[in-house]
Amino acid sequence: MIRMSINTEVRPADAEGIARAAELLRQGELVALPTETVYGIAADARNGEAVSKIFVAKGRPQDNPLIVHVTGPEMLHGLVSEVPERAQLLMAAFCPGPLTIIMPRGPEVAAECCAGLDTVGIRMPSHPVARAVIEASGCAFAAPSANLSGKPSPTTAQHVYHDMAGKIEAIVDGGPCRVGVESTIVDVTGERPRLLRPGGITPGTAAGAAGRIGHRQSRGGRNLRGYGGSRAGHEIHPLYPLRRRDYRHRHRGAGGPLYSPALRA
């Protein structure tokens, strides 16, 4: 059952706050968590009812798939049906970090995460709070940005509270996000990698690890939907770096450095 009014807790990112967030996720509730990119609304990715609450809270179309967050490759069993070689190269180069890799979907991912697709987006966040909650809960979690659909992506707990108070169970306040833009999304399920969304890793940097990356393309005369890619508003050349000024206007307080492997620690 989805409640329409909730007394949203705001918890510090200490041991007690992490334990409370993990408990709520195991109970099928929604919790906003900091990542290195932006704050996300997390739900157990194997619990379809919990994942459905995300769409209600955000006012997000259900045909827009969600990204599943894990701590590392050891959690991929059941979430993906295979790990393509290019995915392995990208994970070795950039994970944990602000990269989402589209892979063939496994049987344990809730259908609600995937919007009818046979693929799933996988990300391994580097933020210590997000990782601690995954480990404490034992849950891979689906987590889009913790804002109302169409609003700027939140980079502080205060931003999340403004949009999500009364709609989710809890917010874990881990301070401002370091990267401040969403993860780069690369699809490795085709003949060559495709950029679905620019973000914290530049397309040229990703291409160096996985081979030349093509643009998001259309099928049947319409743009491919999902994972926030349609919001970029323009194409990014596969060999040219992402310029911060192209995206800063879409994010509250996005001022941190764009990601490089040296910043992962």
Residue ranges and their predicted role:
Residues 2-265:
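Active-site-adjacent structural elements in enzyme catalytic cores
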